Curated annotation (Swiss-Prot):
It catalyses: L-arginyl-[protein] + ATP = N(omega)-phospho-L-arginyl-[protein] + ADP + H(+). A motif (RDXXRA motif of the pArg binding pocket involved in allosteric regulation) lies at residues 338-343. It comes from Geobacillus thermodenitrificans (strain NG80-2). The keyword Transferase applies. This is Protein-arginine kinase.
Length: 363
């Protein structure tokens, strides 16, 4: 398979589109946790009940079209190869928990990959909508419409006083988890992030790494989400998160301008050194690749680097993960082989960018 063909089939729509404030906010995600009446929750249900739930959703929703999202495909975890599951995690379409710890887990995935419905994870279903940039309200509207459509076919576990019943007490109520993925290199470089994270946590929000709980903030990418849902409306949860995100955007932009003033040519040098490494390296580990990609993305946003797509960070942060590298290679790779393949893939992506620029100039 040619790189261009692999790239075009591997990249989800949200990765290659730009949304509001997409210089800092990479994506907005809404997730709704729901359970079905007459079935025990996943923490207690039997294997037979788990299979019945998968069968219910396969029978009711698989291969049906939904609006502009296209048809739903049902992916059963037991039928996927480890590399295939890893790729789904790397694209943020399923959780590591569903991939690794749910033998009767499944996922309904829309054609455009903006919608995924995890089945038999921590709850019977978890509805997820992903949008580029800062679009929490739009993502909530899309998730709510999908939720209503699903509820037209199944009965949810709902309590008049408590709201939607979920396995984890922190999700009881709306069952809503809203999150944004943010690129905050200047706040990291100026070390302001060290005081900002505890302050955000005190406001009832959670700051995590790229792949959620327990993961590292590779490439200066942070995930900010709400923690509690009981006693708050969906709109209140979104508004609270949106306010904090707007403040973070303002702080990051101010920190970037401060760095330009104080570091000047040193900052520009840092950006171009990282670009040089990515364009020419033959071996690169994931941590170094993530840091270099973050530097290059910052350079694009500051206008140092021209004619390179801003979305290169979104795309390559995912395409250079182990699952994707092995999918591109067509089989399992040892860590040192992945480092060679990662370097080659990054060089190919940058060459593709150059070809697009040349074609644009010729027109």
């Amino acid at each position: 398979m040619s790189f261009e063909k692999f790239f075009n089939t591997a990249v989800s729509a949200w990765m290659s589109q730009e949304g509001p404030d997409s210089d800092i906010v990479l994506s907005s995600r809404i997730r709704l946790a729901r359970n079905i009446v007459d079935f025990r929750f996943p923490t207690l249900f039997s294997s037979e009940e788990a299979m019945q739930i998968v069968a219910l959703f396969e029978r009711t929703f698989a291969y049906r079209s939904y609006g502009g999202a296209g048809r739903f495909e049902l992916l059963k975890m037991s039928e996927l190869q480890p590399i295939e599951k890893r790729v789904l995690v790397e694209k943020h379409l399923i959780s590591p928990h569903l991939a690794e710890d749910s033998p009767f887990g499944a996922c309904l995935l829309s054609e455009n990959e903006e919608i995924s419905i995890m089945i038999n994870e921590e709850d019977h279903i978890r509805i997820q909508c992903l949008f580029p940039g800062l679009q929490l309200a739009e993502a909530l509207e899309a998730a709510s419409e999908l939720d209503d459509w699903i509820e037209g076919h199944v009965n949810y576990a709902f309590d008049e006083r408590l709201g939607y019943l979920t396995s984890c007490p922190t999700n009881v109520g709306t069952g809503l988890r809203a999150s944004v993925m943010m690129h905050l290199p200047a706040l990291v470089l100026t070390q302001q992030i060290n005081r900002i994270i505890p302050a955000i946590n005190q406001l009832g929000l959670v700051v995590r790494g790229t792949y959620g709980e327990g993961s590292e903030a590779l490439g200066n990418i942070f995930q900010i989400s709400n923690q509690l849902t009981l006693g708050k409306s969906e709109e209140d949860i979104i508004a609270d998160l949106h306010t904090i995100v707007q403040q973070l955007i303002a702080q990051e932009r101010a920190a970037r301008q401060a760095l330009v003033k104080t570091l000047g040519i040193q900052l520009e040098d840092k950006v171009f050194r990282s670009y040089g490494i990515l364009a020419n390296c033959r071996v690169i580990e994931s941590k170094e690749a993530a840091q270099c990609l973050s530097d290059v993305r910052l350079g694009i946003d500051l206008g140092y680097i021209k004619n390179v797509s801003r979305n290169i960070l979104n795309e390559l942060m995912i395409l250079t993960q182990p699952g994707f590298l092995q999918q591109y290679a067509g089989g399992a790779l040892r860590p040192e082989e992945r480092d060679v393949r990662r370097a080659a893939l990054i060089r190919e992506r940058l060459k593709m960018e150059e070809r697009r620029k040349m074609e644009g100039d010729e027109r």
